[in-house]
């Protein structure tokens, strides 16, 4: 599995700001979208382009456009919605495919409860977004579902990842790509990433 920990200074700075314990909902939400945007820039760097001729202001002009598979953005509810606007800044015409999964706080196992995917998944590149890759369960379940629907080109974008989650994802889906702003130290006994960001969903939405 290709793992990219984005070390751009802007990413390091912004993810550092998100670690503040008493950060406001507004600020956390803004930063989640901003880092999501920067991760998307990195994740789309290998997209192929093709030359086309258009009518310019002074006659025909040759330009480059993205070619190949179209994109679907797949936010994992609910926290993944906090990154979606940042992703769409770069791929505004992408279809949105939504997957609802929550983590059982006792077993730490993923529990799916909703899905609404683009109808043409085999012809799309999926950018799966979720702020946290902790145990990896939610991400693995989402990618399982995408593959069942025929999607073969998948990139996962997360703000913060635990080594345990990275290892679990690589074991389950070695053929995907992972982009993250930080691979943190470890998980605690409750399955939270340390030092992490806390509960990203609560901080993005302002509700527990």
From Swiss-Prot:
Q: Where does 5-phospho-alpha-D-ribose 1-diphosphate bind?
A: 78, 103, 130-138, 199
Note how many cofactor molecules are bound and how: Binds 1 Mg(2+) ion per subunit. The magnesium is bound as Mg-PRPP.
E.C. no: 2.4.2.9
Q: Which SUPFAM superfamilies does the record cross-reference, listed alphabetically?
A: PRTase-like
Q: Could you say which cofactors this protein requires?
A: Mg(2+)
Keywords (A to Z) from UniProt = Allosteric enzyme, Glycosyltransferase, GTP-binding, Magnesium, Nucleotide-binding, Transferase
Gene3D superfamilies per the UniProt record, alphabetical? 3.40.50.2020
Pathway entry: Pyrimidine metabolism; UMP biosynthesis via salvage pathway; UMP from uracil: step 1/1
Extract the GO molecular function terms from the UniProt entry: GTP binding; magnesium ion binding; uracil phosphoribosyltransferase activity
Which reaction(s) does its UniProt entry say it catalyses? UMP + diphosphate = 5-phospho-alpha-D-ribose 1-diphosphate + uracil
**GO biological process assignments:** UMP salvage; uracil salvage
Q: Activity regulation here?
A: Allosterically activated by GTP.
Q: Which residues form a coiled coil?
A: none
Q: Is Glycosyltransferase given among the entry's keywords? A: yes
The kind of enzyme this is, by top-level EC class, is: transferase
Q: Which residues bind uracil?
A: 193, 198-200
Which protein family is named in the record?
Answer: Belongs to the UPRTase family.
PANTHER family for the chain: ADENINE PHOSPHORIBOSYLTRANSFERASE, URACIL PHOSPHORIBOSYLTRANSFERASE, CHLOROPLASTIC
Q: What does this protein do?
A: Catalyzes the conversion of uracil and 5-phospho-alpha-D-ribose 1-diphosphate (PRPP) to UMP and diphosphate.
HAMAP family assigned: Upp_B
Q: What is this protein called?
A: Uracil phosphoribosyltransferase
Per the UniProt record, the source organism is Shewanella pealeana (strain ATCC 700345 / ANG-SQ1)
């Amino acid at each position: 599995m290709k793992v990219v920990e984005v070390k751009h200074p802007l990413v390091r700075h912004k993810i550092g700001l998100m670690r503040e314990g008493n950060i406001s909902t507004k600020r956390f939400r803004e930063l989640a979208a901003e880092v999501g945007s920067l991760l998307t820039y990195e994740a789309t760097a290998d997209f192929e382009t093709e030359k086309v001729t258009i009518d310019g202001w002074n006659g025909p002009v040759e330009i480059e456009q993205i070619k190949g598979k179209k994109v679907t953005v797949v936010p994992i509810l609910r926290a993944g919605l906090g990154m979606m606007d940042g992703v769409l800044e770069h791929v505004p015409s992408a279809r949105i495919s939504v997957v609802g999964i929550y983590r059982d706080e006792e077993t730490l196992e993923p529990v799916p409860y909703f899905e609404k995917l683009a109808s043409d998944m085999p012809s799309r590149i999926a950018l799966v977004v979720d702020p946290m890759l902790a145990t990896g369960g939610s991400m693995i379940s989402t990618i399982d579902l995408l593959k069942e629907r025929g999607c073969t080109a998948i990139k996962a974008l997360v703000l913060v990842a635990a080594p345990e989650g990275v290892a679990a994802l690589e074991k389950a889906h070695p053929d995907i790509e992972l982009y993250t702003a930080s691979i943190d130290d470890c998980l605690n006994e409750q399955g939270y990433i340390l030092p992490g960001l806390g509960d990203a969903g609560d901080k993005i939405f302002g509700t527990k």
